[in-house]
C-alpha cells in the first residue's frame, strides 16, 4: 500500500499507529493488526535515519532488532549480512554509522528494519536521501526482501512505487482519507484534487528562464574550486567548479561521493588537501543546513529574518516574509512551524543577508509538491537578485530547474579504506576488568596521607598510561578536567585549610589532596576511555547478568554522547556563518548550548521510538550478537588492579 499526502497530513503518525507505537487519545481503530506476538513482527523505518541509529558499529546497529528477537548468533550474522546486501549499504560493517553520509545512514536504517524479517513492514520515505540509481536499487531490494510481508510506504514521489503497489491511500488535513483505492483508478478519477492537495506536481517542471545578463558566459564568477581534493572526507578525484552570479547550480551524486565536503569547502569549514578554493568574504555567504532548525536563533519568525547583523535591509526582510508565505506566521515560534515552513524560513533568512553566494543542503527532502515548488520559487528569487546558488540535491524537479548541473562520480570502492582504529594493550581486556582496575585504584587512593606518598602513588598510573591511551591528544583531553580539578582542590586547600593561608605548609597539604584526587580518578578515566560502549553493554548483560533493557538503553545513550561534538560543531558553525559571533563569543556559546540541549532531547525522544520500532519495547528476553569473553590477559589485568589497590599504602610506608 502506498500512503500519500501533503507534508504535515499525518502520514508518519499513521505509520506509528499501525506499528502500535501510539496511544489512542480518541476514536477507535478497526482492522488494525493484532499486537505483535514476537519482537520485530512489525518493522518501522523512521523518516530521519540519524534518529534510527542505535549502536557504535553498523554491524551491531543492524543486529539490534534480531537481538531483541532473542535469535542465536549464527542467525543474527546471517540476517545482518543479508540485510546489508539487500539495502546496498556497501561499507565496512565495523564503521560507526553516524560517520556515514545521510544517504548511507538511510540504507543502514533500512537494513536494520529488514533484518527483523517483519510480517508488516512500514517505511517512511525510505529513498528520500538517495540518488535515482541507488533509490531504484533499494526499491527493488525492498520488494525482493519482503515478498510475503504486508508493505506500507509513505512517500511524496509516487511514480516509482505505483507499478508495485495494490492500493493508494491519500490523506488530507488531520490524516483524513480523501482518496482510497486501486492506484490507477484513484489517479484517473481524482487527479485535479490530488494536484490541489500537493500530492501531485502542478505540471512538468519548466526549464530555467534565461535572465538578462546572467548567461554562463556573461555572468561573473562568484566562487570557485580548482583541482580540489579532500580524500579524508570522500572527495578523492580533483574537482573543478565555478559558481556564477545569478545562476543556480545543482550538485548531485551518490551517497558518499563528497557532496557535503564540496559544500563545506565552499563555506570555509573544510580546507582542501590539494587545489584552491575562492569564495566571497564570510559576510557575503549564506547557508541553509539540511536540518533548518540548526539555524534558528530568534523567538519569532519575523525576528529570525533580521537576526543576522548582515541582514540590514528591513524592507527586504518584510518582502521575503511575504514571498515565503510566512507573513501570517510572523509572530510564531520558528521551532513550532511545519517542516516545509521551517525550510522556507531558513531560506528567507539566508536571503535577507543579501548574500553573493547561497549554499543549500537537500532543501526539498520530505516536502510535498506544493512545498517543493515554494522552495524553488525562493531560489529563483535568489538568482533574480544576482546571488550564485549551489544546492546539493537528489530532487529531479530541482535539478531540471537548475541553470548548471555538476554530477559527482560514485566513490571508488577499490580506494583506500579508512585508517583502522589503533589497537592498544587495553583492548585485550574485558571491559569488566577495566572497570575493576578503576575501582581498585580508587579504593587504594584513600591510603595517601602525605604529599610524598601521593606523588609516589601516581607512579604506576604514569607507567601504565601508554598502554591505555589510543592517541596522545585523546589521553591528554581526558586528563585535563582531572588536572584542573586537582589544581582547584590544591588552591582551595592551601587557601582555606587548617594551616596558615597559602603558606608553605598549606601548599604541601594542597599537593597531597591533589595527588589523592588524581590517584582516585585518573586510572579509571584512562582505562575506561578506551572501552567501546557496546562492548561494555555486552559485558554487563552477559557477564554480570544485569537486566538487558536498562543496559541497552544506557549503551545507546553513551553512543549518542560520543557524537555530541558533531552536533555542537554543526550548531556553532551555522551561527558563526550568520555573523552571530566568533567561536569564543559567550552569547554564541550560550545560544548554541541551549540549541544542543533542545536538539538532544528531541533526538532522544525519536531514538526511543526507533528502538521500540525494532522490537525493544517487547524484548523481555534478548540475545547478544557478540560474546564478552574473559581471557588470560584479564588475569594480568586483575593483578594490575591489585597492584593499584596496595601500591599507595606501600608508597606511604616507603616515605614514612
What feature does the model see in each segment?
Residues 75-92, 223, 314-329:
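Conserved ABC ATPase "signature" region
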Residues 419-453, 457-462, 566, 570-656:
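Transmembrane alpha-helix interface motif
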Residues 96-100, 104, 333-337, 341:
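Conserved ABC ATPase signature
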Residues 113-114, 145, 350-351:
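ABC ATPase C-loop
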Residues 174-199, 397-400, 407-421:
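Conserved beta-strand-loop-alpha-helix hinge in the C-terminal portion
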Residues 110-111, 138, 347:
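Hydrophobic anchor residue at the start of the ABC signature
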Residues 115-119, 352-356:
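A short, proline-enriched helix->beta-strand linker immediately N-terminal to the Walker B motif
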Residues 121-125, 358-362:
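Catalytic Walker B motif of ABC-type/P-loop ATPase nucleotide-binding domains
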Amino acid at each position: 500500500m502506498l500512503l500519500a499526502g501533503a507534508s504535515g497530513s499525518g502520514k508518519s503518525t499513521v505509520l506509528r499507529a499501525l506499528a502500535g507505537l501510539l496511544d489512542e487519545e480518541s476514536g477507535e481503530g478497526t482492522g488494525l493488526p493484532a499486537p505483535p506476538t514476537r519482537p520485530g513482527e512489525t518493522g518501522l523505518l523512521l523518516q530521519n535515519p540519524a534518529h534510527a541509529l542505535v549502536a557504535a558499529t553498523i554491524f551491531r546497529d543492524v543486529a539490534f532488532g534480531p537481538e531483541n528477537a532473542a535469535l542465536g548468533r549464527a542467525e543474527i550474522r546471517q540476517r545482518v549480512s543479508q540485510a546489508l546486501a539487500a539495502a546496498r549499504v556497501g561499507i565496512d560493517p565495523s564503521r560507526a554509522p553516524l560517520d556515514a553520509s545521510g544517504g548511507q545512514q538511510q540504507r543502514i536504517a533500512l537494513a536494520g528494519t529488514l533484518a527483523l524479517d517483519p510480517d508488516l513492514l512500514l517505511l517512511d520515505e525510505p529513498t528520500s536521501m538517495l540518488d535515482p540509481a541507488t533509490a531504484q536499487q533499494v526499491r527493488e531490494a525492498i520488494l525482493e526482501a519482503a515478498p510475503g510481508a504486508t508493505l506500507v510506504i509513505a512517500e511524496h514521489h509516487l511514480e516509482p512505487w505505483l507499478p508495485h503497489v495494490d492500493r493508494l491511500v491519500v490523506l488530507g488535513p488531520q490524516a483524513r482519507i480523501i482518496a482510497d483505492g486501486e492506484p490507477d483508478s484513484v489517479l484517473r478519477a481524482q487527479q485535479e484534487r490530488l494536484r490541489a492537495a500537493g500530492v501531485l506536481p502542478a505540471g512538468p517542471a519548466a526549464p530555467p528562464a534565461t535572465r538578462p545578463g546572467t548567461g554562463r558566459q556573461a555572468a561573473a564568477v562568484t566562487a570557485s574550486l580548482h583541482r580540489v581534493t579532500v580524500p579524508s572526507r570522500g572527495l578523492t578525484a580533483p574537482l573543478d567548479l565555478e559558481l556564477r552570479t545569478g545562476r543556480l547550480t545543482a550538485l548531485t551524486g551518490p551517497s558518499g561521493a563528497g557532496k557535503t565536503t564540496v559544500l563545506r569547502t565552499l563555506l570555509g569549514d573544510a580546507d582542501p588537501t590539494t587545489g584552491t578554493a575562492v569564495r566571497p568574504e564570510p559576510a557575503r555567504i549564506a547557508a541553509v543546513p539540511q536540518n533548518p532548525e540548526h539555524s534558528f536563533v530568534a523567538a519569532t519568525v519575523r525576528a529570525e529574518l533580521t537576526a543576522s547583523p548582515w541582514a540590514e535591509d528591513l524592507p527586504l526582510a518584510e518582502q521575503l516574509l511575504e514571498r515565503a508565505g510566512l507573513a501570517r506566521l510572523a509572530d510564531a515560534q520558528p521551532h513550532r512551524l511545519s517542516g516545509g515552513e521551517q525550510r522556507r524560513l531558513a531560506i528567507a533568512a539566508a536571503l535577507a543577508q543579501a548574500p553573493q553566494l547561497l549554499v543549500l543542503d537537500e532543501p526539498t527532502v520530505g516536502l510535498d509538491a506544493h512545498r517543493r515548488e515554494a522552495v524553488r520559487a525562493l531560489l529563483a528569487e535568489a538568482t533574480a537578485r544576482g546571488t550564485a546558488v549551489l544546492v546539493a540535491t537528489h530532487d529531479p524537479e530541482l535539478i531540471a530547474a537548475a541553470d548548471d548541473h555538476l554530477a559527482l562520480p560514485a566513490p571508488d570502492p577499490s580506494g583506500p579504506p579508512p585508517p583502522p582504529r589503533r589497537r592498544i594493550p587495553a583492548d585485550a581486556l574485558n571491559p569488566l576488568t577495566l572497570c575493576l582496575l578503576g575501582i581498585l585504584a580508587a579504593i587504594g587512593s584513600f591510603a595517601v596521607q602525605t604529599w610524598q606518598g601521593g606523588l609516589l602513588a601516581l607512579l604506576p598510573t604514569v607507567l601504565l598510561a601508554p598502554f591505555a591511551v589510543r592517541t596522545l591528544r585523546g589521553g591528554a583531553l581526558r586528563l585535563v578536567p582531572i588536572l584542573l580539578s586537582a589544581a582547584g582542590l590544591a588552591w582551595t586547600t592551601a587557601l582555606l585549610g587548617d594551616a596558615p593561608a597559602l603558606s608553605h605548609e598549606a601548599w604541601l597539604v594542597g599537593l597531597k589532596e591533589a595527588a589523592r584526587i588524581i590517584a582516585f580518578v585518573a586510572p579509571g578515566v584512562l582505562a575506561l576511555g578506551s572501552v567501546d560502549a557496546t562492548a561494555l553493554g555486552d559485558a554487563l548483560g552477559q557477564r554480570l547478568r544485569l537486566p538487558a533493557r536498562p543496559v541497552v538503553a544506557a549503551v545507546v545513550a553513551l553512543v549518542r554522547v560520543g557524537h555530541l561534538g558533531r552536533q555542537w560543531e554543526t550548531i556553532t558553525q551555522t551561527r558563526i556563518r550568520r555573523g552571530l559571533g566568533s567561536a569564543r563569543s559567550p552569547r554564541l556559546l550560550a545560544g548554541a548550548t541551549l540549541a544542543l540541549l533542545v536538539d538532544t532531547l528531541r533526538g532522544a525522544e525519536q531514538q526511543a521510538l526507533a528502538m521500540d520500532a525494532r522490537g525493544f519495547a517487547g524484548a523481555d528476553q534478548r540475545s547478544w550478537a557478540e560474546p564478552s569473553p574473559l581471557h588470560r590477559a584479564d588475569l594480568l589485568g586483575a593483578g594490575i588492579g591489585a597492584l593499584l589497590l596496595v601500591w599507595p599504602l606501600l608508597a606511604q610506608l616507603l616515605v614514612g
